[in-house]
């Protein structure tokens, strides 16, 4: 059983048959060793008790009820005076029934079987290590052809031919008949090898260090040859080099983790604890069983049949034995991963069996549904909304969430400031929501970052740290620029908030995970904090302005006349004189006082270089004043000159929205320049 205080991680890998036996076997007090499941039965149909040596055997997996054996005797658990510690009649130990959640069993396979994950999953680890085509290995595993066993240094009958099925098709039917003839069993066992046993022998003969050396030499030779000029040959060389790299990495991994390649072929099949594959009785007396039980029963049936063929009858045809070995291999494949070889196996109701892979993988699998993604302490969850007034590194937490997340810190603050005598009084003050509680909460939040996470976390920017502030409502406020890293938008997305507790976690959150420190994509280096969606629409509205030209006031409906030279008035048109401003602060102030609109044209005095003005550009109008000064009016700017043609000032034609956008960019550039100067 995994101790949660000693084990911080879980790794799935290959184990040796000895390790499987150590997990599954146990020695009961009378000296008998139990653990092997030999019968495909579950419960007796009359007594409704587990069958002995079956898939739910109490001798192997422990009692169904704590302290009660299969006979019905009761003993107090943990009482040293109680003797004996097990029932001598049925062999069941008097232990806690929770042992059935982690006590394993095993099935001793009559013939070796390959683990389908390492044979059929891509890339195929077995094919990579043996450097053979997957199709050839599948034919060998499923007894479609045989392999000559190199048992001596001298050539033998079949060693001259090797894997003969692919070379001479006429041998396809004659050779099996030859070897299945009565009296040739010794010769057959000496000369040929087929099934997963042949794969196991080849894997056991591998030297991983020699594989690495030979692969490296071949990779260097292919790299020195250079391009051949033939596109097809060049592609084959590239694929071969990639294969050699994968093969070397795989061999290094086996050496580093002390895993033997032959462990990919199973001799002992582990049996899951009964509580992980239960049989439940529902209303009406009907039983509901896990599909794993039916798949285990199929394996045991076929394995026992193969055992009977090999032990009870010496004259069993070899073809029948090979066919039964193939059935055992297919049964184990279905148990581990149903449907990986094509059409999945179904029950009587045409429903696909859920194999071990289906139980553990996917969103509804054991890991993601039961072990991962669960609620933890000091965490919350809510819908995100936009917070346009927030800084990039801040987020808004609702009061209801914040007081729950930081409740222990607030209690400590109340006790330290002698505002509460104990924890109970502090909790009552928090429930009453006294003003001092919010003051202490704000002090706590100022020195404590929080982590925001949006599922699915596909890269490291899926979880970032922020400085929290209190907001009203029940939603989390987020700066819109950080949405791209989370792949989030404000259409109802939810995010989880976590509080880092340890000093190491807080230091990591402050130094590495703050949102304003993750402005570039870690994958390609492009900016990731860029305006999207609502911000782009807002910037468009801010800088769009009116489409009215500079001559709109002159050629407007107020100046329209009919054929009788009479003025035509329109009540919907409002004459707007374009105002002049000396600086941007006056223009923004006028907008805030609602004297001008956001998109209303205005003239702003500007320090513009004369060289940017095209000398060939002709003014649209020239207005003269009484003292001789005049205004040259162009499409987007206006120049005030003296009598001596000296330039007094220049006005540009813009809007309050453009001015506001320009000021934001200018402040950002100045802040960035100051930050760079501090770093240098």
From Swiss-Prot:
Similarity-based family: Belongs to the RNA polymerase beta' chain family. RpoC1 subfamily.
Cofactors, names only: Mg(2+); Zn(2+)
Highest taxon of source: Eukaryota
UniProt xrefs under InterPro entries: DNA-dir_RpoC_beta_prime (IPR045867), RNA_pol_asu (IPR000722), RNA_pol_N (IPR006592), RNA_pol_Rpb1_1 (IPR007080), RNA_pol_Rpb1_3_sf (IPR042102), RNA_pol_Rpb1_clamp_domain (IPR044893), RNApol_RpoC1 (IPR034678)
Catalytic activity: RNA(n) + a ribonucleoside 5'-triphosphate = RNA(n+1) + diphosphate
Cell compartment(s), UniProt: Plastid, Chloroplast
GO molecular function, one term: zinc ion binding
Keyword Chloroplast: yes
EC number(s) recorded for this UniProt protein: 2.7.7.6
Signal peptide positions on this chain: none
Record GO biological process: DNA-templated transcription
Binding-site residues, Zn(2+): 69, 71, 87, 90
Assembly description: In plastids the minimal PEP RNA polymerase catalytic core is composed of four subunits: alpha, beta, beta', and beta''. When a (nuclear-encoded) sigma factor is associated with the core the holoenzyme is formed, which can initiate transcription.
Residues the record lists as binding Mg(2+): 489, 491, 493
Cited SMART domains: RPOLA_N (SM00663)
Function: DNA-dependent RNA polymerase catalyzes the transcription of DNA into RNA using the four ribonucleoside triphosphates as substrates.
Assigned keywords, A-Z: Chloroplast, DNA-directed RNA polymerase, Magnesium, Metal-binding, Nucleotidyltransferase, Plastid, Transcription, Transferase, Zinc
Coiled coil: none
Cofactor binding description: Binds 1 Mg(2+) ion per subunit. Binds 1 Zn(2+) ion per subunit.
Stated name of the protein: DNA-directed RNA polymerase subunit beta'
């Amino acid at each position: 059983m995994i101790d949660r205080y000693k084990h911080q991680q879980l790794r799935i890998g290959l184990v040796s048959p000895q390790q499987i036996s150590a997990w599954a076997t146990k020695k009961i007090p009378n000296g008998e060793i139990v653990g092997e499941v030999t019968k495909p039965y579950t419960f007796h149909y009359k007594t409704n008790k587990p069958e002995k040596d079956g898939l739910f055997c109490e001798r192997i997996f422990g009692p169904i009820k704590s302290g009660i054996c299969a006979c019905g005797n009761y003993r107090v658990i943990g009482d040293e005076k109680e003797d004996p510690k097990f029932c001598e009649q049925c062999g069941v130990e008097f232990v806690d029934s929770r042992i059935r959640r982690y006590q394993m069993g095993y099935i001793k396979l009559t013939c070796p079987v390959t683990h389908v994950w390492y044979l059929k999953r891509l890339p195929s680890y077995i094919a990579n290590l043996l450097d053979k085509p997957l199709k050839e290995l599948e034919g060998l595993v499923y007894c479609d052809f045989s392999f000559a066993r190199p048992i001596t240094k001298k050539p033998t009958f079949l060693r001259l031919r090797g894997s003969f099925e692919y070379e001479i098709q006429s041998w396809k039917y004659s050779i099996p008949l030859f070897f299945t003839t009565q009296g040739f069993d010794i010769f057959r066992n000496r000369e040929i090898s087929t099934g997963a046993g042949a794969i196991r022998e080849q894997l056991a003969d591998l030297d991983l260090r020699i594989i690495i050396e030979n692969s490296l030499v071949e990779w260097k030779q292919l790299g020195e040859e250079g391009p051949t000029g033939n596109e097809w040959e060049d592609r084959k060389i590239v694929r071969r080099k990639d294969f050699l790299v994968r093969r070397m990495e795989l061999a290094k991994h086996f050496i580093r983790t002390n895993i033997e390649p032959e462990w990919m072929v199973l001799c002992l099949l582990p049996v899951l604890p009964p509580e992980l594959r239960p049989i439940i009785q529902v209303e009406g007396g009907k039983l509901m069983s896990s599909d794993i039980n039916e798949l285990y029963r199929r394996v045991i049936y076929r394995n026992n049949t193969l055992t009977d063929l090999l032990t009870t009858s010496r004259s069993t045809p070899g073809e029948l034995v090979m066919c039964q070995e193939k059935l055992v291999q297919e049964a184990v494949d279905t148990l581990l991963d149903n449907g990986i070889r094509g059409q999945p196996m179904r029950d009587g109701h045409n429903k696909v069996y859920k194999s071990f892979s289906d139980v553990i993988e996917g969103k509804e699998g054991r890991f993601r549904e039961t072990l991962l993604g669960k609620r933890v302490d000091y965490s919350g969850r809510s819908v995100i909304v936009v917070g346009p007034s927030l800084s990039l590194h801040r987020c808004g937490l609702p009061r209801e969430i914040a007081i729950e997340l930081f409740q222990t810190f607030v209690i400590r603050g109340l006790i330290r400031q002698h505002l509460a005598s104990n924890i109970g009084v502090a909790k009552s003050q928090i429930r009453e929501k006294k003003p001092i509680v919010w003051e202490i909460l704000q002090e706590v939040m100022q020195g404590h970052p929080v982590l925001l996470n949006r599922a699915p976390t596909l890269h490291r920017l899926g979880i970032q740290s922020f400085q929290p502030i209190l907001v009203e409502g029940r939603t989390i406020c987020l700066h819109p620029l950080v949405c791209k890293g989370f792949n989030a938008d404000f259409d109802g997305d939810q995010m989880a908030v976590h509080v880092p507790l340890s000093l190491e976690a807080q230091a990591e959150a402050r130094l590495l995970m703050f949102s304003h420190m993750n402005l570039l994509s870690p994958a390609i280096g492009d900016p990731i904090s860029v305006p999207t969606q609502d911000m782009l629409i807002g910037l468009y509205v801010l800088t769009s302005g009116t489409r009215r030209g500079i001559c709109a006031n002159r050629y407007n409906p107020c100046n329209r006349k009919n054929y009788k030279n009479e003025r035509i008035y329109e009540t919907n048109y409002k004459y707007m004189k374009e105002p002049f401003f000396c600086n941007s602060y006056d223009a923004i102030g006028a907008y805030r006082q609602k004297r001008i609109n956001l998109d209303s044209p205005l003239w702003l005095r500007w320090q513009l270089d004369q060289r940017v003005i095209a000398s060939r550009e002709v003014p649209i109008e020239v207005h003269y004043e009484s003292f001789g000064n005049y205004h040259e009016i162009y499409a987007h700017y206006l120049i005030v000159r003296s009598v001596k043609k000296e330039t007094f000032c220049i006005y540009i034609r813009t809007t309050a929205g453009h001015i506001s956008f320009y000021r934001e960019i200018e402040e950002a550039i100045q802040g960035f320049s100051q930050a760079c100067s501090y770093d240098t």
